[in-house]
Amino acid sequence: MEENNKANIYDSSSIKVLEGLEAVRKRPGMYIGSTGEEGLHHMIWEIVDNSIDEAMGGFASFVKLTLEDNFVTRVEDDGRGIPVDIHPKTNRSTVETVFTVLHAGGKFDNDSYKVSGGLHGVGASVVNALSSSFKVWVFRQNKKYFLSFSDGGKVIGDLVQEGNSEKEHGTIVEFVPDFSVMEKSDYKQTVIVSRLQQLAFLNKGIRIDFVDNRKQNPQSFSWKYDGGLVEYIHHLNNEKEPLFNEVIADEKTETVKAVNRDENYTVKVEVAFQYNKTYNQSIFSFCNNINTTEGGTHVEGFRNALVKIINRFAVENKFLKDSDEKINRDDVCEGLTAIISIKHPNPQYEGQTKKKLGNTEVRPLVNSVVSEIFERFMLENPQEANAIIRKTLLAQEARRRSQEARELTRRKSPFDSGSLPGKLADCTTRDPSISELYIVEGDSAGGTAKTGRDRYFQAILPLRGKILNVEKSNFEQIFNNAEISALVMAIGCGIKPDFELEKLRYSKIVIMTDADVDGAHIRTLLLTFFFRFMYPLVEQGNIFIAQPPLYKVSYSHKDLYMHTDVQLEQWKSQNPNVKFGLQRYKGLGEMDALQLWETTMDPKVRTLLKVTVEDASIADKAFSLLMGDEVPPRREFIEKNARSVKNIDI
């Protein structure tokens, strides 16, 4: 009871001050990751996360983000409102302290927040430091307060009470990024929509609104998912055929003791999962709403529970004998879509990226929660239980049969030329940091590329026709495919679950296909393979797409190369009186070696598009939709996006 009373008291004593703000503008990258597009969006998330924390604590029911022209960014919630009394340490108003002192926030007072993704003051002061204008309105007990800052956190006057308000409680923060520090680039609506919808799924019952007023036709979005993770699973599996209709889900809050530390934590675990008829696993994990893309102890606990329960039921129901090889973690995850979300007051992460959860006390807790709900489901639904066991046994059998083929793709040394595919024209250097692999469509274009390349650092691997669609294939089919085997051997890392990034032979892997429909299909097949089986290469930014020209314009003894119809029309409108010859390239094979080098392979003049993934769950849905078996959703997607297909951003 005493603990609950403390949590309900939110005043200046709840805000702990740790250090000053001076370093933020000098080294912004240390605080928000970068000064570019990613950092710009990070500023939004710092303020949004404060509001989400209020909602997670049960103090707010809605969060609203509004974007106006000229980068005016506004976040509103109906939480408790930042305390307005004088802070005992700074002798300034607590509102001013929160937005001007780095790490002055409720995060460091466990009575104010039990868990946190971002907190009043923790990131808010950083956003203020990187803003040219920063304003805050606080509503407490039907009174309205206002404070403003400019030029990186310089306060303009004291906190003022502007009178009474119909709004009982809450906070509004409005800021404009300072582009003398930040690089100017537009907010991306797709990135914002993706993250806000994800937050709505992860925090059931909270309404999140987004109003984008930057265009002539304002757009608004609103999300509220009372089903939480169950609705998230339905959303992710929308383009896949489920093995059964029910989503297995549970949530539990327990007090656990930290391993090797005399501390107890109240941890909330939420899980939801469903099997489908594909061969790919889609497991997404979160800690305090932050995507732990590299997994961690919560994912380990989840997988261990599946292995334990499925093997036990397989033996008890005579699918396996005690002496048989048991189903492993890869087998049980084939065709599985799962969300694991935990709320922890003191998360610990492994490595510098902070994308892998390291709290050891989480593993047995998640294992226990998943084991209990999964065992109950298997007992109460014997038909579905048998379907799960049969699917995992098929995965096990395919894995066994693929072992021999898999060994062929492994190489003791990434530079062991005796293990390289015969059609690979390798480069001379053994330095992976400068070497490049061009994956070229067809033997003809491959031959031209071999002649035109700089053989010191550029390797060429021609592919014969379209590679296997891995979205519809199991392990055995994939490992027995000649083109994929050649690709895997050339790159040198193996594929999941045995992927080893340190064995990568080339820093750039460049997909070079014709600029036609077939070329686009081959490119998509390759991207599907990389996303499903070599995801770290996508995540680390090693995959690129070459941009061969579409046209050659010849005039006055000059040759110009154009990559798009728009470029050609622009040139024609700017040169209305120039007589010129025009050649349209239907494929790479129509260029000679010198032209291919000068237009597409020479690092001094070429254009390469780096393949990136902003949200793995969205990319997962896109590949399932475009490359899977379900025709109606694919037709709907194409009809909806046909006119803007060139702008699809995976």
Curated annotation (Swiss-Prot):
Entry similarity comment: Belongs to the type II topoisomerase GyrB family.
Organism of this sequence: Mycoplasma genitalium (strain ATCC 33530 / DSM 19775 / NCTC 10195 / G37) (Mycoplasmoides genitalium)
GO cellular component: chromosome; cytoplasm
Entry-linked SUPFAM superfamilies: ATPase domain of HSP90 chaperone/DNA topoisomerase II/histidine kinase, Ribosomal protein S5 domain 2-like, Type II DNA topoisomerase
Cofactor remark: Binds two Mg(2+) per subunit. The magnesium ions form salt bridges with both the protein and the DNA. Can also accept other divalent metal cations, such as Mn(2+) or Ca(2+).
Catalytic activity: ATP-dependent breakage, passage and rejoining of double-stranded DNA
Subcellular location: Cytoplasm
Protein name per Swiss-Prot or TrEMBL: DNA gyrase subunit B
Limits of the Toprim domain: 435-549
Record's subunit section: Heterotetramer, composed of two GyrA and two GyrB chains. In the heterotetramer, GyrA contains the active site tyrosine that forms a transient covalent intermediate with DNA, while GyrB binds cofactors and catalyzes ATP hydrolysis.
